[in-house]
């Protein structure tokens, strides 16, 4: 499999996005209804409120999947390998628009064929430092012909891999990957999982 411990690629300039202290996330009740907003910086702690996010898996023109290694400065799960990118929609922002915006900011990618594949994915996970993620997190796939230009504050490293190779690596060493990727790999057919995407999916990880 592609070496997932390779030397980090040089980061390139990326579009400016508001600092997390100014970024608002959408708060949700247990039924998934929007109940308000809060600064992103205030909702990721030891008692994280349920909020709306998204994950995206990006394929290139050869069918390879982009995996990224989270920057060491990230609050939660620094330095672990994960799916192509994640993010949070702004209040009233359509999710596909948020996916494209985040791809441009974090990786310098222009996306096409943005499609939901796990629209009801939900999880709660706690990292080694006690930081909790608690999200309803629709999962998307997309395609790109762009060359990644990773933002250094977001991405330490990246690699293009065959989906089957990633599936094998996640199952062999789940501790090396983000918990949401480990859970998604159990559900996504291209990673060897299986799920009816119309069914609400939930998982708790500590």
Swiss-Prot record:
GO terms for biological process: dimethylallyl diphosphate biosynthetic process; isoprenoid biosynthetic process. Pathway: Isoprenoid biosynthesis; dimethylallyl diphosphate biosynthesis; dimethylallyl diphosphate from isopentenyl diphosphate: step 1/1. Residues 49-183 form the Nudix hydrolase domain. Binds 1 Mg(2+) ion per subunit. The magnesium ion binds only when substrate is bound. Mn(2+) binds at residues 44, 51, 88, 133, 135. One of its GO terms (molecular function) is metal ion binding. Its main location: cytoplasm. Mg(2+) binds at residues 86, 106. The keyword Methyltransferase does not apply. It holds the Pfam family NUDIX. It is an enzyme of class 5 (isomerase). It comes from the Bacteria. Belongs to the IPP isomerase type 1 family. Catalyzes the 1,3-allylic rearrangement of the homoallylic substrate isopentenyl (IPP) to its highly electrophilic allylic isomer, dimethylallyl diphosphate (DMAPP). This is Isopentenyl-diphosphate Delta-isomerase. It comes from Agromyces mediolanus.
